[in-house]
A protein has these predicted regions:
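Conserved GNAT acetyl-CoA-binding A-motif
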Residues: 110-122
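Conserved catalytic-core motifs of GNAT/GCN5-like acyltransferases
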Residues: 69-72, 77, 121-122, 134, ...
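Helix-loop element at the rim of GNAT/NAT acetyltransferase active sites that forms part
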Residues: 13, 21-37
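A short beta-loop-alpha structural element at the N-terminal edge
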Residues: 6-19
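Acetyl-CoA-dependent GNAT
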Residues: 32, 36-92, 103-104, 109, ...
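Conserved beta-strand-loop-alpha-helix junction that forms the acyl-donor binding cleft
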Residues: 94, 120-130
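Conserved acetyl-CoA-binding loop-helix of GNAT-fold acetyltransferases
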Residues: 95-108, 130-135
Length: 168
């Protein structure tokens, strides 16, 4: 992996193996998700919104460094402008601004589409993700205590959201 600035591209089927591999690394790391297995590619693409999913690519070798994608929180019309997102960065690419660049791309695409709120759940132990989200304009809404079990222990999840100042 080079240390050059990353390139952001739309997430496409050709990225499937790398994206699901990074998802797997997040699961194995223990502080990214309550999931125990990555979804199939078919399920991944069926549940994430087209036009609002991106990969960060290393301009040196073309490798995928991370990804971001979102899905609607509800099919009710009142929540049409509210999405939940996930952002994952390969462990070897952390500290390079990959997550920040991915969040910026997601914010730009969702605002252009009239989406007014982006939210996510983050484990309180994931200080780097909480800091990155705060720097991108997300605020902590609250903590959902004992939301789910992981490896025989209850996990809390911090709910963060970003309300777009561009959508009034």
């Amino acid at each position: 992996m080079s240390r050059q600035p990353v390139r952001i591209e739309p997430l496409e089927a050709r990225h499937a193996r790398a994206v699901l591999g990074i998802y797997r690394l997040g699961i194995d790391g223990g502080d990214a998700t309550l999931e125990t297995e990555p979804p199939t590619w078919e399920r991944f693409t069926a549940t994430r919104m087209p036009g609002h999913r991106f990969v960060a690519v290393d301009p040196g070798d073309g490798g995928v460094l991370g990804w971001v994608a979102c899905k609607r929180v509800s099919d009710r019309g009142a929540y049409a402008g509210v999405v939940e997102h996930s952002v994952y960065v390969h462990p070897d690419a952390r500290g390079r601004g990959v997550g920040k660049a991915l969040l910026r791309a997601l914010i730009e695409s969702t605002e252009a589409a009239g989406i007014w709120t982006i939210q996510s759940g983050i484990f309180p132990e994931n200080a780097a993700s909480l800091a990155m989200h705060a720097a991108a304009g997300f605020r902590v809404v609250g903590t959902r205590e004992r939301l789910g079990r992981q490896h025989d222990r209850w996990r809390d999840v911090v709910l963060v959201e970003r309300r777009s100042p561009a959508i009034v």
